[in-house]
Regions:
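Amphipathic alpha-helical linker/stalk segments
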Residues: 61-80, 118-120, 124
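N-terminal intrinsically disordered/low-complexity leader segments
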Residues: 1-8, 181-194
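Amphipathic alpha-helical packing segments from all-alpha helical-bundle domains
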Residues: 103-139, 162-177
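Alpha-helical DNA-contacting segments of helix-turn-helix folds
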Residues: 21, 55-63, 71, 98, ...
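Amphipathic C-terminal alpha-helical segment
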Residues: 97, 141-159, 174-185
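Helix-turn-helix
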Residues: 12, 16-54
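Helical hydrophobic small-molecule/effector-binding pocket
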Residues: 78-112, 141-144, 152
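Generic hydrophobic, amphipathic alpha-helix propensity
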Residues: 9-17, 34, 59-67
């Protein structure tokens, strides 16, 4: 009797890989560990995925969806910042996965749901089309990412963590308020404007 295909196998593989990445980051994600956690064999894994990069791309997309679910509930600039930090701190390995080559993906114009949401939120608040606010959104994203990176540093004292968050929120709100009075344009015509 011929073997029947396991229709849920690919989903189990991605779930297993995501679990491994969430718990241990890149060092935990080996093809053997994924196969073992998904209750399959390494050759079966390679039949469905060429290499680790294929799996990482699916994991990145899932992490982006989870981050987007955090960000889309924001109802103010401050809330947007705080939700960003909450995601980064609660899901540090996923945050790393999303941002590892974010600038490269920006240049390739690959999907970045939370960044697109930020541009849309700026357009809703300031008027105009989302793409008109790409430069401001890029500046705000850099501000958020820099602050989140500092917050993810081991042993950050709570007082410093609070000060970093407060300073970032204040700078974020100031940039948005200043943009309300005039058009924010970066000094270059690079990928952020496309």
């Amino acid at each position: 009797m011929p073997r029947t295909a396991d229709t849920g196998l690919e989903g189990r593989i991605v779930d297993a890989a995501y679990q491994l990445w969430s718990q241990g980051g890149e060092r935990a994600l080996t093809m053997r560990a994924v196969a073992r956690t998904a209750r399959t064999t390494t050759p079966t894994l390679y039949q469905r995925f060429r290499d680790k990069k294929d799996i990482l791309e699916l994991l990145r997309k899932r992490a982006q969806e989870i981050m987007f679910s955090y960000m889309r509930r924001a109802h103010s600039a401050e809330d947007f910042c705080l939700r960003y930090f909450e995601f980064a701190l609660k899901h540090s390995n996923e945050y790393e996965l999303i941002h590892a080559d974010w600038v490269v993906r920006l240049a390739k114009e690959e999907p970045r749901p939370s960044f697109e949401l930020l541009k849309k939120s700026l357009a809703d608040r300031l008027g105009g089309a989302p793409e008109e606010h790409a430069g401001l959104a890029l500046a705000l994203a850099a501000l958020l990412h820099g602050t989140a990176t500092m917050l993810l540093t081991k042993r950050v004292p709570e007082r410093i963590s609070r000060e970093l968050r407060h300073a970032c929120v204040a700078a974020f709100e100031t940039l948005v308020e200043n943009a309300a009075g005039r058009s924010f344009r970066p000094n270059h015509h690079g990928a952020a404007r496309r």
